[in-house]
Amino acid sequence: MYLIVSTLILLFLLISISYKINIVQYEIKSEKIDREMNILFLSDLHSCDYGINQKKLMDKIKSVDCDVILLGGDIVDDKLKPKKAFELLEQLQQLGKKVYYVHGNHEKRIENLDEIDKAIKNYGVQILDNEEEFLSNNIKLIGVDDSSGEILDDYENELDILDDNLNSENFNICLIHKPDYYFKKNLKKFDLMISGHTHGGQWRLPFIFNGIISPGQGLFPKYAGGIYNDDYTLIVSRGLAKEKTVVPRIFNRPEINLIKLTNINNS
């Protein structure tokens, strides 16, 4: 009996705990999209190790065709050394793609963040701190800095102003670490929000619940990972954290995301 139970437990662990990187793809259609574009999104690496020069991760990245790369925060961890994060940035630089980065809450906790940011920029990465960039004539990316360490009322007032000043004729993309301001409704005029932070709710049970716990959302979070369409579209990545996490990821493989933007009239 003991052998049977032990075997069943071992089988469960082998099936449920996997750190093989998943590529999750989404297609977003809008009449405001003026050119087809593939966006690669990575979030929540937390300076974790995917082999020498992040080979396991880079093999996945190189297997997809993308036009631009977005990094959604917590790429550099506040506890682990930044070496593995910098290895990733160095490898991304060699791809020759434009790379944009927003801070997450763990980067905002780093005491020498100015030095870390300088190193990030040396890899050709553009950090967006409540700043915007056009990815095409009509596709605008707005990178929003994380709220950690900020006075919350002032921060949310800035978000309201940013939201009010959007040009609705553009296809507006919000790159922000936490998805909280999607359901808090501070940012409600975008066409697409791309976030991470949740680590996929840590534990999942497919077809039953999508995550057990997430910071900012508590137990059984609605926005733990996937695509959502309430007022507009939200994509939440389950991210790449592994050895940094206190508990193992169960039925919750680390992931990167390929987001295809297409004009609705071309489909």
Name these PLM-found stretches.
Residues 1-34:
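N-terminal membrane-anchoring alpha-helices
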Residues 16-18, 216-218, 248-249:
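Short Gly/Pro-enriched turn/cap motifs at secondary-structure boundaries
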Residues 18, 45-50, 76-80, 147-153, ...:
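Short, flexible loop segments at the rims of nucleotide/cofactor-binding pockets, characterized by
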Residues 29-30, 55-64, 181-186:
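Short amphipathic alpha-helices and their capping/turn segments at secondary-structure boundaries
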Residues 32, 45-47, 107-192, 198, ...:
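Conserved catalytic scaffold of divalent metal-dependent phosphoesterases
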Residues 35-128, 134:
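Membrane-embedded segments
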Residues 200-206:
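His/Asp/Glu-enriched short active-site or ligand-binding loop at hydrolase and phosphoryl-transfer sites
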Residues 206-219:
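Short, surface-exposed loop/helix-turn segments at secondary-structure junctions
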